Amino acid sequence: MILAVDVGNTNIVFGGFDNNGELRFISRLNTQVSRMEDQYAIKLKDILSLYGFENAAITGLNIKIDDPSVLGSDLVCGGVAAKSKYPTPCIFIDVGTCLKIFALDRSGAMLGGAIAPGPRLSFEALSGKTASLPLIGAEPVGKMIGTNSPDSMRAGVIGGIACMIDGMIERYEEELGEKATIVATGGYASLIAPLCRRELIVDPDLVLEGLHIIYKKNQKK
């Protein structure tokens, strides 16, 4: 399938063509500046699913969660790239607005994962829901025992996420029954990885590479 996209100020129009050049479907989505990239990706995945283009057929990824249709496209792409590039079982971690920790089993199937607030959401919650804590940005943590509010917040958020990742890896491997390759991506991955006690492979382009792998796979059909 070839997906043609016409992005306008009011609507985004999607057209799906089969390999014979026949237009299979047209779908429209309201253009909203406030939507994040992931939200558009989810909407697009829903549209493709509506017209019979399922994840397994498009991506080659065996998704074993309760409802594969609700898995975010960023996680699908990350799973595809992790399966292609690294030994399995594999735990891939996306440290962005949300912290997403997902697992592939030895066969490369997506088992599921965990979702928690990432650095940005955590800092916004601390500032927005308390009377005196400032809104700060994510910066490297020098020491875990902070001596002022910003340093203590960074130690709690950045250092705390690193500790969460270490703990979740340990528990995931208990459920998997073996050690796993650990891959981290997302905007904050390079900031978090040095604080983790487990070695993380930082792969900032994992999701984009997954998109490319999916494109090449479908180009062959």
Question: In which residue ranges do the predicted regions lie?
Answer:
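Phosphate-binding/catalytic loop of phosphoryl-transfer enzymes
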Residues: 18, 60-130, 159-168, 200
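A short, N-terminal amphipathic alpha-helix
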Residues: 38-53, 168-175, 214
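Short glycine-aspartate micro-motif
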Residues: 2-6, 90-94, 183
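Adenine-nucleotide phosphate-binding core of ATP-dependent small-molecule kinases
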Residues: 141-178, 199-200
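Short hydrophobic/aromatic-enriched beta-strand-loop microsegments
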Residues: 24-25, 54, 110-115, 200-208
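Short glycine-rich phosphate-binding loop at a beta-alpha junction
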Residues: 46-58, 178-187
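Glycine-rich phosphate-binding/hydrolytic loop that grips phosphoryl groups
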Residues: 76, 131, 163, 200-221
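Short glycine-rich, Thr/Ser-proximal phosphate-binding strand/loop in the N-terminal lobe
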Residues: 2-42, 107-134, 139
